[in-house]
Amino acid sequence: MNKMLRYLSDYKRESVLAPLFKMLEATFDLFVPLVMADIVNVGIAAHDFHYILVRCGILLLLAIVGLTCSLTAQYFSAKAAVGYSTGLRHALFEHIQTLSFSEMDTMGTSTLITRMTSDVNQVQSGLNLFLRLFLRSPFVVFGAMIMAFTVNFRAALIFVVAIPLLSIVVFGVMVITRPLYKSVQTRLDRVLGLTRENLTGVRVVRAFDKEKSEVDRFEDANELLTKMQLHVGHISALMNPLTYVIINLAIVALLYVGSIEINIGGMASGDVIALVNYMNQILVELVKLANLIVQVSKALACAGRVQAVLDTKPGMEFPAQLTGNVPAEKAGDAVRFDHVSLTYKGAGAPSLSDISFTARRGQTIGVIGGTGSGKSSLISLIPRFYDATEGSVEIMGRPVRQYPRADLRSKVAVVMQKAQLFGGTIRSNLLWGSQNASDADLWAALETAQAAEFVKAKPLGLDEPVEQGGRNLSGGQKQRLTIARALVGKPDILILDDSASALDYATDAALRKALAALPGDLTVFIVSQRAASLQHADQIIVLDDGRMVGLGRHAELLESCPVYKEIYESQFKKGDAQK
């Protein structure tokens, strides 16, 4: 947990001043009962209106100064807490960007979002409360007891008995409810996870008429949360009546002892009022202290979860610079797999087994296979989204692990299955491919991706707004824009991971023709469910259950590969393939 304190290093001054100003406020509060006692003992007893007025002025001054100190402390604590959470959130987001797909798969997107949002916010709230109360509350408790002894020693002995009893009740309730609050947080995370999952997949829910089952599933989780919250609430609700019973008994004892002391001349009636006020101050601060401990406990639990993400080391290390030379015999290679196998973390069986092939520069490589055959797993090894568990993957004659991250990303462009665009404009999305691209480069990429026509039809052209996720574009338009984005960077290797599935056959064919006509030695990997889309590829890799069962051209595979022949003929008979 000490590691997380470094994000508070820029706010040391605020972290010191906030509790100091709260202690100043508490100091002024401790003098209020004494001034009130003076008003009763001297002003009211002597019917001295001027004395009462002066003491009321002192009370007003104490209130104003105390309020000023409180606001100042609040400013410094809020500044420190907000600054801390900003730095923590930035560090967390930056660290997440370094994680490989393996770590992302293990933790899950929804978990990381929770860590970035609610957990960091909880840490911020806990820190803000801690800076304001961790010194003030103990200071007031002990200060009020000391001040009570200055008023009357015998009466103050009641405080010695009452404070431990109050502490037992307050902290006893806190100890019991603390683990229960953790259970509440766990169940709340479950409810939030279900909500996020439902809202993310709302179209699928509606398509399958699953609204009722989703409501039932949410209701079950919400009911468990409600029961736990009620259980904790019932226990927490015991705090106020129990503490007030102790306080009232203590006040009765104070009044009894005070009346005796007044009769024998040991103290005045105003002193009894002061002692009662000190007792109330102690009660308030003990309750605040208990709430502080509960909130800090929640914050520490959240901080632990955030720290767990920060402690997660990236599974991949990229070198700082490219070293070594490419052997002459590999100068023409674009991609080479040498007995490559891949087993995902936590998976029982390998997703890829003993894959070997070589793709030459300028070739078009098709990848086909049934659902779950390992197509996406295979192409994810080329840009090193995952590391092969066995064998080696080479890019342009070098092992992929020798490439710095930036060099590898500039050489390999990937268009994912799900077309993902970001809020902004068409231009800003295309510039992800290369920040230095000119308008001519953007239009050239759009022409190749068969997207220029619909972009030109937009009122603002390249500056047409794009909503988050590309909600204002059709599926085919989004896919073509993501292909254009990949082409803007002019990569050596382009991977299309079933990224033309929303295109009609004519557009798909035009895209493949345009890619083949590009100058240079662009190597293209096309993952597709359509055998017709791969007929003209230089090589077609056929996968079945993670194994390569065929490698060759279309005509060769029809003769030698039963799996490919079955795929092709099943589509041809349905009229979905072209000769």
Regions found by a protein language model. Give the residues of each.
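ABC-type nucleotide-binding domain
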Residues: 326-579
